[in-house]
Structures are given as structure tokens and as C-alpha cells.
């Protein structure tokens, strides 16, 4: 089925989603399965960047991911600790893989790394014990460090370092219009959180513990400019706070969390955040 036919079939099915179940057969199931396979192989992406830097969301692919939950029944998944099983609708990306398939894929997945089917992992990526949800895209030479999560349909660029315990939000619940996007050469510090469709532009650095959502103010302390929903290229962010409005009784109100751009990336920053090629051999 062509991409345009896939898109039309999935859009129509999504509008009639209340009629779809695990018993549904035929064109709709075939279209969703094909769309998920394209995502899994990296031949289609939920969001794509054009030459001008504008990201376009392929909403029909996101709809395909959502429809798969209606189409697929629960089943046991082997591999739990102590011979236990899990109970879910989405199989592992690695189900049925052997040595040759991993060598062909060209990335590292250490014990404890969980990737759900329809997520794409590019060559030379490194997955420590982490979780990559369905529909996500993790590009070449990116490190997803221990206990980090890459949410549904999130788009992670090349040579990105996602430090330990980072949360990259998904789009499925609560339902978001667009995925979180981390562009090439970014560094996301430990225990940071990027959610609600925020875009982190190329080369930006988030210090440890930066929390960004759709309404978080990002304040450039040099210029006073305020950004919302997007981190500028090569910005270095740290956690901050804005003074709150006085309360009705005149006492100072609580401050509001924000992120602060303290500088742009320089050579000193690069030396601290550059990736280690030895880990990707």
C-alpha cells in the first residue's frame, strides 16, 4: 500500500475508532501493521525536519500507533526476572532477534534496555538500562543512559547524550499535538525532564535537573528574552525561578519555576559534554 493510501486508510479508521477492536481484520489492520513496520525500520517518522528547521508532524502515523492499542489483544511476554512473564499488547522490538539481526542493526542494547516494537534505534546508538516507547526515533551515535525514558513518538537526534534518569515525554497520554524533539548534538543533564512537545534545538545543553513543559518560561538572563516551548540552538540552561506575585495580604507570593539561559555553548562546555567515541565502537 502506498504512503498516501496508508494515510487515508488510517485517518478514516481513526475517525471510526469506536468500531475497531481486536477482532478487526482486513485493510485497517494491514495498514496499521504496515505503518508500525515503517516506524520500526526508520523508514517513516512521526515528525520530520525540513531544510529551514521547521518540524512537521505526521499525525496519521501517531494515529496508527493509537489504533494499534485497539487492534491488538493482551498476551504474555516472556523474559521477566526469575522466569516471570509480562502482560501487554506491545511486543519487544527485539522479539525473535539473534546475533545476526543485532549486528545488522548496529546499535548496543545492554541488559535491562527495553524497546517496544515500532521504535527505531539507529546505528552506533547505545542503550543502557532504559525504556524507549513505541513510535520513538533515536538517531545515530546517541546515548540513552541508565533509567532514562524516551516517550512515545519522541524524536531524538544524532550524537545526543541523554543522561541518567532523564524523562523525555511522550504524546499518547496525556494526548499531545506534537512529540518532544531533541535535535542533533544536544546534552540533556541527569534527572531533567522534557515534555509536552517541547523542541530542544541543535547543540543545546540542559544542566542537571532542568524541567521543561509547554508553558515553562525559558529566560535569557543576558537579554531578558523569554522563550516558551523551544530551546534555542546552543543555549546552556540551568534550573531557575521567577519571583511570584504578592499575595492578597501583601506578603511575597511563591516563586515560579523556570529555566535560565546562562550562556551559549563554548569550547569549555563542549569539552564537558562531548560524546566518547570509544563507547560507540
UniProtKB/Swiss-Prot annotation:
Pfam families to which the protein is assigned, alphabetical? Hexapep_2 (PF14602), THDPS_N_2 (PF14805)
A GO molecular function term, named singly, is:
2,3,4,5-tetrahydropyridine-2,6-dicarboxylate N-succinyltransferase activity
| Biological process according to GO | diaminopimelate biosynthetic process; lysine biosynthetic process via diaminopimelate
Q: Which UniProt keywords apply?
A: Acyltransferase, Amino-acid biosynthesis, Cytoplasm, Diaminopimelate biosynthesis, Lysine biosynthesis, Repeat, Transferase
Location of the protein in the cell: Cytoplasm
Q: Catalytic activity, per the record?
A: (S)-2,3,4,5-tetrahydrodipicolinate + succinyl-CoA + H2O = (S)-2-succinylamino-6-oxoheptanedioate + CoA
Q: Does the keyword Endoplasmic reticulum apply?
A: no
Q: Which domain of life is it from?
A: Bacteria
Q: Which InterPro entries match?
A: DapD_Trfase_Hexpep_rpt_fam (IPR005664), Hexapep (IPR001451), THP_succinylTrfase_dom1 (IPR023180), THP_succinylTrfase_N_sf (IPR037133), Trimer_LpxA-like_sf (IPR011004)
**Under which pathway is this protein filed?**
Amino-acid biosynthesis; L-lysine biosynthesis via DAP pathway; LL-2,6-diaminopimelate from (S)-tetrahydrodipicolinate (succinylase route): step 1/3
The EC designation for this entry is: 2.3.1.117
| Residues the record lists as binding substrate | 108, 145
- The top EC class, named as a word, is transferase
- GO CC, alphabetical: cytoplasm
Indicate the quaternary assembly: Homotrimer.
- UniProt cross-references to NCBIfam families, sorted A to Z: dapD (TIGR00965), PRK11830.1 (NF008808)
Tell me its family.
Belongs to the transferase hexapeptide repeat family.
PANTHER family reported for this sequence: 2,3,4,5-TETRAHYDROPYRIDINE-2,6-DICARBOXYLATE N-SUCCINYLTRANSFERASE, MOLYBDENUM COFACTOR GUANYLYLTRANSFERASE
Q: Indicate what this protein is called per its UniProt record.
A: 2,3,4,5-tetrahydropyridine-2,6-dicarboxylate N-succinyltransferase
The gene coding this protein: dapD
